Amino acid sequence: VHILSHTLHYGTGVFEGVRAYLTENGPAIFKLKDHTKRLFDAASKIGINISFTEDELNKAQCDTLIKNNLKEGYLRTIVFLGNEGLGLRAKDLSVNVAVAAWEWPSYMDPEAKKNGISVIKSSHTQYENPLHSGNKIIGTYFSNTMALHEALDKGADEALMLDKNGYISEGSGENIFIVKDDVIYTPTTEHCLNGITRQSVMQIAEDLQLQIFEKDIDYEYLLNADEAFFTGTAVEILSLIHISEPTRPRLIS
């Protein structure tokens, strides 16, 4: 990546992350086609034309997994612009695509993954622009990063971000689900990523004939939840067991 890459300076790029799991039939990448489709959708929204087809990128990801001798792992595909011009007016820049793969057993500490994590309400608001909420656009992750660092500095494991209306949005990089009286709730996607793991959990819940609803969820509702968990490609499914609320710390079963 050139030091004057437009993406490095202005965040003009998109990315996707997928996980591969070892099955009885060999390694399999979870929801690969869905992730690649979302990558292309994100690129089109910010005016980037990827010169490869979705099938070609799917094959490239599978090949990368194999060439790295991985049975399980995480793959990151990134689309970034070249260095032919700098400044916001730069046009006709080259479009580059790279795929990386590595072992990443746990996004969190293994003990945290096993026992659950603590979260704290962030002072950083999520997604003012609905364009960004449905895709992984590089330049939109600054507030997420700041929210996570703020949470870690305060002794929590993760941040809980609210939207501009004060409703729960998501974690710094995860969707959230809340269980109350055997009913599952998750925020609408107006101000959060419509995660592919999120979609899978919702489909499984429906297949199991569990009640699940998308709705605006206020912070107080979380404090009174019976259960809560995060979902995401990196984090997979992770229990929330403690809310670091200064005036009312809350343990969740």
What do the PLM-derived regions correspond to, one by one?
Residues 72-74, 156-157:
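Short secondary-structure junction motifs
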